[in-house]
């Protein structure tokens, strides 16, 4: 059963999907079940993957890692997502970009997720 906002990946073709409405069915791609991506479970440098949330007067800045994450062709952050108050905001990144994103100022509890093409899904709350 897929739950709202879960992220799944096809290990054959690399498709990644986020569930917008949960349901009882199984997510399938390339004829095989997709894998649920669990946050913060890959054995990798946490200081380069756990998102850091910075609140400013102008908005929210999310930086990937307390030490900047590489943004190279073979190893980079594909996207950063902010979830708050029933809304999801996402910034897609490319190699060469800074590993950060700016979002509008939002009050209340925040959850931030990012996806590293080599080390998977990471999150933090603030």
Swiss-Prot record:
<dbReference type="InterPro" id="IPR004462">
    <property type="entry name" value="Desulfoferrodoxin_N"/>
</dbReference>
<protein>
    <recommendedName>
        <fullName>Desulfoferrodoxin</fullName>
        <ecNumber>1.15.1.2</ecNumber>
    </recommendedName>
</protein>
<dbReference type="Pfam" id="PF01880">
    <property type="entry name" value="Desulfoferrodox"/>
</dbReference>
<keyword id="KW-0249">Electron transport</keyword>
<feature type="binding site">
    <location>
        <position position="10"/>
    </location>
    <ligand>
        <name>Fe cation 1</name>
    </ligand>
</feature>
<dbReference type="InterPro" id="IPR038094">
    <property type="entry name" value="Desulfoferrodoxin_N_sf"/>
</dbReference>
<keyword id="KW-0408">Iron</keyword>
<feature type="binding site">
    <location>
        <position position="116"/>
    </location>
    <ligand>
        <name>Fe cation 2</name>
    </ligand>
</feature>
<feature type="binding site">
    <location>
        <position position="69"/>
    </location>
    <ligand>
        <name>Fe cation 2</name>
    </ligand>
</feature>
<comment type="subunit">
    <text>Homodimer.</text>
</comment>
<feature type="binding site">
    <location>
        <position position="75"/>
    </location>
    <ligand>
        <name>Fe cation 2</name>
    </ligand>
</feature>
<feature type="binding site">
    <location>
        <position position="30"/>
    </location>
    <ligand>
        <name>Fe cation 1</name>
    </ligand>
</feature>
<keyword id="KW-0813">Transport</keyword>
<dbReference type="GO" id="GO:0005506">
    <property type="term" value="F:iron ion binding"/>
</dbReference>
<comment type="function">
    <text>Catalyzes the one-electron reduction of superoxide anion radical to hydrogen peroxide at a nonheme ferrous iron center. Plays a fundamental role in case of oxidative stress via its superoxide detoxification activity.</text>
</comment>
<dbReference type="InterPro" id="IPR036073">
    <property type="entry name" value="Desulfoferrodoxin_Fe-bd_dom_sf"/>
</dbReference>
<feature type="binding site">
    <location>
        <position position="13"/>
    </location>
    <ligand>
        <name>Fe cation 1</name>
    </ligand>
</feature>
<dbReference type="InterPro" id="IPR004793">
    <property type="entry name" value="Desulfoferrodoxin_rbo"/>
</dbReference>
<feature type="binding site">
    <location>
        <position position="119"/>
    </location>
    <ligand>
        <name>Fe cation 2</name>
    </ligand>
</feature>
<feature type="binding site">
    <location>
        <position position="49"/>
    </location>
    <ligand>
        <name>Fe cation 2</name>
    </ligand>
</feature>
<dbReference type="Pfam" id="PF06397">
    <property type="entry name" value="Desulfoferrod_N"/>
</dbReference>
<dbReference type="GO" id="GO:0050605">
    <property type="term" value="F:superoxide reductase activity"/>
</dbReference>
<feature type="binding site">
    <location>
        <position position="29"/>
    </location>
    <ligand>
        <name>Fe cation 1</name>
    </ligand>
</feature>
<keyword id="KW-0560">Oxidoreductase</keyword>
<comment type="similarity">
    <text>Belongs to the desulfoferrodoxin family.</text>
</comment>
<keyword id="KW-0479">Metal-binding</keyword>
<dbReference type="InterPro" id="IPR051233">
    <property type="entry name" value="Desulfoferrodoxin_SOR"/>
</dbReference>
<dbReference type="InterPro" id="IPR002742">
    <property type="entry name" value="Desulfoferrodoxin_Fe-bd_dom"/>
</dbReference>
<dbReference type="GO" id="GO:0019430">
    <property type="term" value="P:removal of superoxide radicals"/>
</dbReference>
<keyword id="KW-0216">Detoxification</keyword>
């Amino acid at each position: 059963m897929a739950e709202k906002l879960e992220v799944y990946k096809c290990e054959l073709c690399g498709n990644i999907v986020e569930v917008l409405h949960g349901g009882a069915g199984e997510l399938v791609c390339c004829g095989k079940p997709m894998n649920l991506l669990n946050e913060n479970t890959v054995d990798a440098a946490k200081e380069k993957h756990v998102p850091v949330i910075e609140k400013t007067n102008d908005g929210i800045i999310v930086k990937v890692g307390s030490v900047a994450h590489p943004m190279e062709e073979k190893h980079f952050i594909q996207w950063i997502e902010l979830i708050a108050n029933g809304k999801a905001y996402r910034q897609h990144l490319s190699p060469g970009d800074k590993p950060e994103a700016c979002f509008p100022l939002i009050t209340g509890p925040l959850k931030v997720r990012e996806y590293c093409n080599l080390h998977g899904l990471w999150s933090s709350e603030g």
